C-alpha cells in the first residue's frame, strides 16, 4: 500500500505557491490532488473571485477534511499566517499520514504582493512556520522562490 502523504505548500502572498505547486506536485512528488482556495474562488466567481473568498476558504477546509478522512494523498497551499492546521497535522499523522511542509521564502516583504496586511501575514507566516509548524511535520524544506529558479535553503524532519 503506498504511503499516505500530505504536502503543505506555504509562504507569503506573492511567493509563487500555485506556480511552484503546478510543477512540484505532479512531477516531483506524484501528487495530483491540490486544494487551493484561490482556485476554488475563481471557479465560484470567475469575474470577481474576491467576492467568493470566504466561501472558497470554507470549501477548501471541507475538502481537506474529506481527503484526510478518505486516506487520499493530497496537497494544499497556505500562508501559515494562522494556526488552523496545528491540530490537523497531529490528527493526520495519527491516521498514518506523512506530512511535509515546503515553505517558499522571499528575501523581503517587498517581494511580496502588497502593503500592510501582507506585511503582517509575511511575518506571522514565517514565525508560525519556525515556531509552530516545523516541529510538528515529518519533513520540511525552505526554498528561496524569489529567483527565476527555486533554490533549496534548508531541510529537515523527524521520523
Features from the language model and the residues they span:
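Conserved lysine of the Walker
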Residues: 17
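Conserved beta-strand scaffold positions in the cores of enzyme catalytic domains, especially
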Residues: 34, 99-101, 140-142
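Glycine-rich phosphate-binding loop used to anchor ATP phosphates in small-molecule kinases
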Residues: 55-106, 121-122
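Pre-Walker A (Motif I) flank of P-loop NTPase domains
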Residues: 2-7, 70-72
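Conserved GTP-binding G-domain of TRAFAC-class P-loop NTPases and closely related GTPase folds
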Residues: 10, 108-159
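Conserved substrate/cofactor phosphate-moiety recognition/catalytic segment
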Residues: 21-72
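Walker A (P-loop) phosphate-binding loop of P-loop NTPases
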Residues: 14
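Conserved nucleotide-binding/hydrolysis micro-motifs of P-loop NTPases
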Residues: 27, 39-41, 81-82, 105-109, ...
Amino acid at each position: 500500500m503506498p504511503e499516505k502523504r500530505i504536502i503543505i505548500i506555504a509562504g507569503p502572498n506573492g511567493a509563487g505557491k500555485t506556480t511552484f505547486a503546478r510543477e512540484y506536485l505532479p512531477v516531483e512528488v506524484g501528487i495530483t490532488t491540490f486544494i487551493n482556495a484561490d482556485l476554488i474562488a475563481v471557479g465560484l466567481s470567475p469575474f470577481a473571485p474576491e467576492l467568493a473568498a470566504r466561501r472558497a476558504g470554507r470549501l477548501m477546509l471541507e475538502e481537506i477534511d474529506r481527503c484526510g478522512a478518505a486516506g487520499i494523498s493530497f496537497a494544499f497551499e497556505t500562508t501559515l499566517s494562522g494556526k488552523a492546521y496545528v491540530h490537523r497535522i497531529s490528527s493526520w499523522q495519527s491516521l498514518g499520514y506523512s506530512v511535509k511542509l515546503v515553505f517558499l521564502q522571499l528575501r523581503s516583504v517587498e517581494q511580496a504582493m502588497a502593503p500592510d496586511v501582507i506585511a503582517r501575514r509575511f511575518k506571522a507566516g514565517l514565525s508560525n512556520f519556525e515556531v509552530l509548524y516545523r516541529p510538528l511535520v515529518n519533513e520540511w524544506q525552505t526554498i528561496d522562490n524569489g529567483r527565476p529558479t527555486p533554490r533549496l535553503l534548508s531541510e529537515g524532519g523527524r521520523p
